A protein has these predicted regions:
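The feature encodes the CheY-like receiver
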Residues: 12, 56
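Active-site residues of response regulator receiver
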Residues: 52
Length: 115
């Protein structure tokens, strides 16, 4: 299952619908703290986290760091409209705006790289 976190409801819904149509199971959250709580309840439920960099509560990079304390090596994609260089290993950056197919390619590449 993919956990997608973004505070833009329209984008979150679009990504959920698009990835679901391609056969991915998707859970969404609009806030980093809510996403962390969901992840803490069942860290093995999620195969990947996809998060915006700028979120309410705390940023996407911190969210990934906290998730990885529970599940080291969790595959992750961070998205942002601003240039960004991930500090953590194994985090893929996807610049907004992006085409849905670009996200699918990033998801497939990231999942393949983690296996």
């Amino acid at each position: 299952m993919l956990l997608i976190v973004d505070d833009e409801p329209n984008l979150l819904d679009l990504l959920r619908r698009y990835l679901s149509r391609l056969g991915y199971e998707v859970e969404t959250c609009g806030d980093a703290q809510d996403a962390l709580s969901l992840f803490q309840a069942a860290p093995d439920r999620f195969s990947m986290a996809i998060t915006d960099l700028t979120l309410p509560s705390f940023n996407g990079e911190e969210l990934i760091e906290r998730m990885r304390q529970l599940r080291p090596g969790l595959p992750a994609i961070i998205t942002s409209g601003y240039p960004y260089q991930p500090r953590a290993a194994g985090v893929v950056f996807l610049q907004k705006p992006f085409l849905p197919q670009m996200l699918v390619e990033a998801v497939e590449k990231t999942l393949k790289g983690s296996s």
